[in-house]
Each structure stands twice: as C-alpha cells, then as structure tokens.
From Swiss-Prot:
This is Lovastatin esterase. It catalyses: lovastatin + H2O = monacolin J + (S)-2-methylbutanoate + H(+); pravastatin lactone + H2O = pravastatin diol lactone + (S)-2-methylbutanoate + H(+); mevastatin + H2O = compactin diol lactone + (S)-2-methylbutanoate + H(+). The lineage of its organism: Eukaryota, Fungi, Dikarya, Ascomycota, Pezizomycotina. PcEST can be used to directly produce monacolin J through single-step fermentation, which would be easily applied to industrial production with the existing equipment and fermentation process of lovastatin production and beneficial for the current simvastatin industry and hypercholesterolemia market. GO terms for molecular function: hydrolase activity. Changing S57A: Abolishes the catalytic activity.
Amino acid sequence: MDTTFQAAIDTGKINGAVVCATDAQGHFVYNKATGERTLLSGEKQPQQLDDVLYLASATKLITTIAALQCVEDGLLSLDGDLSSIAPELAAKYVLTGFTDDESPLDDPPARPITLKMLLTHSSGTSYHFLDPSIAKWRAQYANPENEKPRLVEEMFTYPLSFQPGTGWMYGPGLDWAGRVVERVTGGTLMEFMQKRIFDPLGITDSQFYPVTREDLRARLVDLNPSDPGALGSAVIGGGGEMNLRGRGAFGGHGLFLTGLDFVKILRSLLANDGMLLKPAAVDNMFQQHLGPEAAASHRAALASPLGPFFRVGTDPETKVGYGLGGLLTLEDVDGWYGERTLTWGGGLTLTWFIDRKNNLCGVGAIQAVLPVDGDLMADLKQTFRHDIYRKYSAWKGQQ
C-alpha cells in the first residue's frame, strides 16, 4: 500500500491518501495519512488524519443508521407504506418506454414503496446517469438545470425504473430516506445525525454540503484551486453538479467527515456495542434483504458494464447480495473478506468495509488529482482492501 500510493503521488495522479482501520476491540489500529493537500491559496500542507473528507455515497451508510434508529423509535417500519410520509414517492409511475412521438409510457405502481426498498435500491428510483430511459425522460420533462437549488423531492422528480420491490438499480433512495427521517422527526437530517450518531461517538467535525464552518474549511481536502467551491469534484470524478444543484441535506451523497471519525462509526457497528443501534438491528444490517426478483436484477446489474462499480472490489465469482447499508458478501473469500462483510464506497476514490467474521473494518480515501484516472483509483482502492488484511494478519502473528 505505501509504495503503491507513493508511486501514484510521484506520477502526479494523486495528492495523497487517508487510511483508517481497526478491529472491534481497538487493539489493532492502523491510521495513516500519506502525501499532501493543496490549500485554496495554493500552499501545500502534509495530509493529516483529521483532514475533512467528502464522503459522497459513503454518506449512505450513515443515513441508513439514522433511518434504522427511527425504526427503533417506532417512527418508521422497514416494510410499512411510506405514502403518507412521502406522497411524492407514492405519486410516481413506472416508466415502461416511449411512443413513436416520444411521449412516455408508464404504469401505476403495483405496490407502495417501503423504507427497506429505499435502503436497498429496490424501490425503482434510479440515478438518471445510470438509466438511459430515465435520462431521456429527464431531458424532456425535468426542471431546467439553471434554476435555484432544489430539495430532494424537487431534484428527483423522475418516474420509477421498475415496479417497487421487483428490481435493483443504484439511485437516490437514501436521499429520499433522509427526507423521510426529517419528516418523521421534525428536524433536519444533520440535527438527528448529530444527536443520535455523532454525539454518542464523540464526533464533532461533520457537515452536509456546503461546508460553512471555518474550522472545517481549514481542513477541507476538497477546498483547493481545482475545486474552489468544495464540491468534491476529485471524489466523484469532476463536475459536482449534484451538490451544486441541491438544497438541504442529501442523505445519499452530501456529508463531509474525517477518516478517523468515519472509522468510529464502522467500529461501533463491527463491535455491535449498542451505541448506535440495538444488537438485533445491527445483525439485520448484515442480512441479504433483496427478494428473488430484486436479487435477480441485482445479479444482472453486477454482470453489466457497470458491474465493477457495483461490486466494490469483489470478484465476479463471489456470491454477493445487498444488506442495509451496502453490498453484502454471501460467502468467504480466502484470505480476505469473510461471509457477510458489508462494503460500499464514495465516488471513485473512497471505499469502506465491515468484516464481522474476521473482526476488521476500515476506510480508504484516495485524494485524486483532476482529471481523475478511474482505473488507477480502482486499483489503489483494491490495494488498500487487500493490504490492510495483510497488515492485520501480520499484526496477529506477532501477538
């Protein structure tokens, strides 16, 4: 990992990296910051472990925890109808195609959307950039791009890609779940996360886009001459339009946090210490939650050209499903992930995992240089995923 990361720094492909990993007991701890970051002024500083990182889709895990806390509070249920809480979701039809004159064809939803569907990407809500039909509909009917920033329900106005519960496609389900949390709690998603997730773990340095706290901006990796708006462009591969166009908390992609703090959340789930959720609720996160139809659709997505992105480092031969919070391995991988390891990431540059069977969790955040070399980022993330197990194994051999 060290030599591979340094080689990428030396060739100018990345600026640095932050890696944090631990076992449940905190006996094995590996925290390392490599390289340097550039300040908005152009000045360079060594990468620090407490630098504030853009989580992008790694936000989804934290939003999942918040939603499950609302389930524990009796405010929501995993399989309940969300129509009264999110009528905008209930009003969505399923896009089935277009007529010869390009008018959309759609069917009414056969069943209500549930929280579990939102958390597992089986609700039918898809990102437009992953579904050509939704992209086509959006180009014709969605709100003009240059209007004022939008809330979740204003940005994701497009129809469903498939009948709720019958398919799988990556999408804004966690953004909707975050709004559902806000509506049942009567506050902002950030307020709820701070009180119920961050405060119990001693986390004080987090904010949804835009980061306005000056103490955080001083440590914000993504505030630099290449990204003066701190959109997280180097994490998501350029642009940053979703942050720029959004207003309010987007539970699918909007959080900024340090690597040290993110691994606190991973460790709490790994240890199942009751700090965030009751043990049974954490156990439930590490179960396959896709029904037969959605699981078949998930397998098709994994075999598609987008499959490498959706597999987050697992081999095509490895049996996987989808838990509450990320991809779930359904079998052991020799020398690496144990069965029921939960894993996902953020953009092109960040990845995390929780392996309860082998008692290890970690996050690796590569600080890319624009334009982002996606293939190299995939290789570097994979180096982290495997080398951290080698380091853990070597440590255990010395105990």
